[in-house]
């Protein structure tokens, strides 16, 4: 069995993290030539390319597997070293999360871990349909995803669901939906999406009003919190998690445009197996808090 040299594997990791050889060399305090030599040595060991030399560089499928292995080794080292790490650099935990979880329940869930443990979070925000891919590529050690199936050598648990309501301000509703939400009125009402791959709004309209994708005007805004602001100021109608706008709904600042209709996104927590002690703390914290605030039915 071919075994990786972890010094050379860290060079591969640095090139991916730093998005190039020059910055990787600076990060590792070695020359750029030395970085190239280490990666070439690793590729010779496995007899295949591990890095696609694009701008920025990206790992091959085998490179992804090795980076995933490195993440596991780093966490397991933390578990074995235990108290010997007291006073050293806090452990880096890279997690892939969706913006709506980050804006609502995730940080309160992690608060006990952050208060009790020497860790540094690296939260990589991605759509919940794509977060699992970051785990597959070895970029993170855990991911909040809508995918129910675990990747090979990974664990998965159900967290609960976010229910998305179709909301707007009262002035917006009076302007665009004076006679209620109809197929015709929706064609004129500005909407918003997180990015060009975010299809929740379009899917909701297609499912409930038979509107084809791309038929409504749509802003692109990469911020979950900005969705709320856009709706409050009467700029757009939005799909927003109920958990995020409970106060606005109670006060009447925002209204549910289609009572009884909503989009449900069940969320799952994925991570490598076996879990380190620190990742077990993270898992316990996420599951405990998620089961309290997310829909379980």
Swiss-Prot record:
Keyword annotations for this protein? Answer: DNA-binding, Transcription, Transcription regulation
The molecular function terms of the Gene Ontology recorded here are:
DNA binding; DNA-binding transcription factor activity
Keyword Transcription assigned: yes
Where is the DNA-binding region? 21-40
List the SUPFAM superfamilies hit by this protein, alphabetically. Answer: Periplasmic binding protein-like II, Winged helix' DNA-binding domain
The keyword Transcription regulation appears for this protein:
yes
Looking at the record, the residues that make up the HTH lysR-type domain are 4-60
PANTHER family noted in UniProt = HTH-TYPE TRANSCRIPTIONAL REGULATOR ARGP, TRANSCRIPTIONAL REGULATOR
Its quaternary organisation is: Homodimer.
- Name the protein family: Belongs to the LysR transcriptional regulatory family.
Q: What role does it play?
A: Controls the transcription of genes involved in arginine and lysine metabolism.
What's the protein called, per UniProt? HTH-type transcriptional regulator ArgP
Organism encoding this protein: Cronobacter sakazakii (strain ATCC BAA-894)
Its ancestry begins with: Bacteria, Pseudomonadati, Pseudomonadota, Gammaproteobacteria, Enterobacterales
């Amino acid at each position: 069995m071919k075994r990786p040299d972890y010094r050379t594997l860290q060079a591969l990791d640095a090139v991916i993290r730093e998005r190039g050889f020059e910055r990787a060399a600076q990060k590792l305090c070695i020359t750029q030539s030395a970085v190239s030599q280490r990666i070439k040595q690793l590729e010779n060991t496995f007899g295949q390319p591990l890095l696609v030399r694009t701008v920025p560089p990206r790992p091959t499928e085998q490179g992804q597997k090795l980076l995933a292995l490195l993440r596991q080794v780093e966490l397991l080292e933390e578990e074995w070293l235990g108290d010997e790490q007291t006073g050293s650099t806090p452990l880096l935990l890279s997690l892939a999360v969706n913006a709506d979880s980050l804006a609502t329940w995730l940080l309160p869930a992690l608060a006990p871990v952050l208060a009790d443990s020497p860790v540094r979070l690296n939260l990589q925000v991605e759509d919940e349909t794509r977060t699992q891919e970051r785990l597959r590529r070895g970029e993170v050690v855990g991911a909040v995803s809508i995918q129910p199936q675990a990747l090979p050598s990974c664990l998965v648990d159900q967290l609960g669901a976010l229910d998305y309501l179709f909301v707007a301000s009262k002035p917006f509703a009076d302007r665009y939906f004076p006679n209620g939400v109809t197929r015709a009125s929706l064609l004129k009402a500005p909407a918003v999406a997180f990015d060009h791959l975010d299809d929740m709004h379009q899917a909701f309209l297609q499912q409930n009003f038979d509107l084809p994708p791309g038929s409504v005007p749509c802003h692109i805004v990469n911020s979950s919190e900005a969705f709320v602001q856009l709706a409050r100021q009467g700029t757009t109608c939005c799909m927003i998690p109920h958990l995020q706008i409970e106060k606005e709904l109670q006060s009447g600042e925002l209204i549910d445009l289609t009572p009884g209709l909503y989009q449900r996104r069940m969320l799952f927590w994925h991570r490598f197996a076996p879990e380190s002690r620190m990742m077990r703390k993270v898992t316990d914290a996420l599951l405990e808090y998620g089961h309290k605030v997310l829909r379980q039915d």
